[in-house]
Amino acid sequence: MVIHLLLALVLASADQWPEFRGPSGQGHASDTGLPLDWSESRNVVWKTPVAGRGWSSPVVADGRIWLTTSTENTEGRRRGVSLRALAFESATGREIVNTEVFRVDRPEALNGKNSYASPTPIVDGDRIYVHFGAQGTAALTTAGDVVWRTRLDYQSQHGNGGSPIRYGDLLIVNCDGNGGEGDAYVVALDVKTGKTRWKATRRSPADQAYTTPLVIRVGERDELVSVGAYRAAAYDPANGKEIWRVSYEDGFSNVPRPVFGQGLVFIATGFQQPSLIAVRPDGTGDVTRSHVAWTLRRGAPLTPSPIVVGDQLFVVNDTGIATCVDAKTGTIQWQQRLGGTYSASPIYADGRIYFPSEEGVTTVIEPGTAFKQLAVNSLDGAILASMAVADRSFFIRTHSHLYRISDITAGGSRVRGFGGSRVRDAGAIQRQVAASICPGCL
């Protein structure tokens, strides 16, 4: 399994972004030559509409961008919500797959900020795995044909949130409901059949949470770090057996995905009184008193995931306060108000950190022990989905559109036939631009 994990990282080349937060699951991209700045009239290769409503983040592989979305029917006999998988050509933005995976006649109530299509899909070879929380999980071919479907039973108060991950031949999902005993658990499905291979029930008390797990390597063992309400736990990803757990008070409705660096796992504890704890992952049993290295109580995020770059940990909270701390000690090195509100997670690419806000504004900084802002970039639309990076481009989903952002002016000249307000939806001009920056893609 160690070999499989290493190969997955090595083989995930710069033209792939296969899951939420990229090949490592921690928001790091290997691409260079990425744009520093953009706007509606600058460095937009293409912009294409996305039907429906959804906050799943883009994933990219083999020249395609995959998303999920939900569309509502309010007329006629077929009322309810259609949960769909979409694919777009990376070179042109043209929609090439639009498949209904599930139809829900009476969908659950949502938090006003959430959607019925918030978990990010996984693309792995000739399979796409999509997850719509308690509404259903499925595997598709790259042509959009459904291979299998299953439904995971739990009661989610505000809709779905956490994304699935792939570990060998397992698809692993956090299912944190608030329906009482046994309604919060972690489950591993067989990727070929969708059948349950193992299930680990959360310890009591349990409540709703919306997180994505992370597999890390600690010594001679793999650990599946899964954050839930009131506690996080590490499991053996092969069989679901608990390795260690850490508890925290007033922690539920967790959203951020944990990250790992400098020998520590960084965990956001959730709603009400958010904090971020750094845990040494080499323990067993209850490590609450023995393995918490430090706690950040000021500026911890409710929704965006943290990111580790070198010796520093960077976070932005939901109200726009960015914080840099020493990852080993927890010492705050700077805090800065970026402005706006934040749900999307930051990424590190080409030596820079990108923080996209809900207002469509992305603040770019240079990582370091002093705050240094490099650019502020605006698009017309709300951003709650996290960015994808592939083919020396950013793929950004707003509430209504999908963008490909590239440094199309590299070398000092603008791409022929593209400029100013002439950005259009996918079409002939997109193919011309795409061919100039990606020869052979068409």
Which role does the model predict for each range below?
Residues 1-8:
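Sec-dependent signal peptide recognition
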Residues 13-417, 429, 433, 437-442:
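Noncatalytic, solvent-exposed loop/strand surfaces
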